A protein has these predicted regions:
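Active-site helix of classical SDR
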Residues: 141, 145-148
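SDR active-site strand-loop-helix element
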Residues: 8, 32, 70-74, 113-119, ...
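N-terminal Rossmann NAD(P)H-binding glycine-rich loop of SDR-like oxidoreductase domains
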Residues: 5-25
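NAD(P)-dependent short-chain dehydrogenase/reductase
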Residues: 127-128, 151-198
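Conserved Rossmann-fold NAD(P)-dependent oxidoreductase catalytic core, especially the SDR/UDP-sugar
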Residues: 72, 98-139
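NAD(P)H-binding glycine-rich loop region in Rossmannoid oxidoreductase-like domains
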Residues: 54-92
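Conserved glycine-rich Rossmann-like NAD(P)H-binding loop of the short-chain dehydrogenase/reductase
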Residues: 27-36
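Rossmann-fold cofactor-recognition segment
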Residues: 44-57
């Protein structure tokens, strides 16, 4: 019987690549997120099942599955959004993470959780190189919210014995990326008739 994985935020750049990877490893893949996906789009990114919904205990339980692995890619992915809409950013990032953790604690304590975090947690660091023990000083609401989510993951791991790995991903690029410096540069070059200077 195939192992089962739940990917929150599976339609996004990171989530869709995670889904494709685990599908290629033979997992039965389940995804949840805010946007709609057609059956064809789901299959293109390696999803067997897609649910358009908020990330909540209730919505995860509606899959009626016990997952071996959960990769929580859901939440806000924009520093700019967090500055313009800090409350909404908090709900997406922190509340969504808490829903996943509570689902695991109460309903699926044997699952392994992978939480992709961000270097925004570390913020600006005067000392180089940055060491793993550096507590960080986030420079944006996005960074603070990711830090709170990391702290929740660490707390649930220590207090309830949940198996959680936090991975801070730096400068992730690849097919399907539609934001960040590389994307912006390529679009400017593609759409410009003049010389592009950065």
């Amino acid at each position: 019987m195939s192992k089962k994985i739940l990917i929150t935020g599976a339609k996004g750049f990171l989530g869709s690549n995670v889904s494709t990877h685990f599908k290629n490893l033979g997992y039965e893949t389940y995804g949840i997120g805010h946007d709609g996906l057609s059956v064809e789009e789901s299959k293109e990114i390696g999803l067997d099942y897609w649910k358009k919904d908020d990330i909540s205990i209730k919505s995860i339980l509606e899959f009626e599955q016990i997952f071996d692995v959960i990769v929580h890619c859901g939440g806000s992915g924009s520093v700019g959004f967090s500055v313009e809409h800090p409350y909404d950013d908090f709900k997406k990032t922190v509340d969504g993470t808490l829903e996943v953790l509570e689902y695991m604690r109460v309903h699926n304590p044997n699952a392994k959780l992978i939480y992709p975090s961000s270097p925004a947690v570390q913020g600006e660091c005067e000392d180089a190189p940055i060491i793993e023990e550096y507590l960080g000083k986030p420079a944006s609401p996005y960074g603070y919210h990711k830090k709170i989510a990391e702290d929740l993951c660490q707390s649930y791991s220590e207090k309830f014995g949940l198996k959680i790995s936090i991975v801070r991903l730096f400068s992730v690029y690849g097919n399907g990326l539609k934001k960040q410096l590389l994307w912006d540069a390529c679009k400017k070059i593609q759409n410009s008739k003049d010389e592009v200077v950065f």
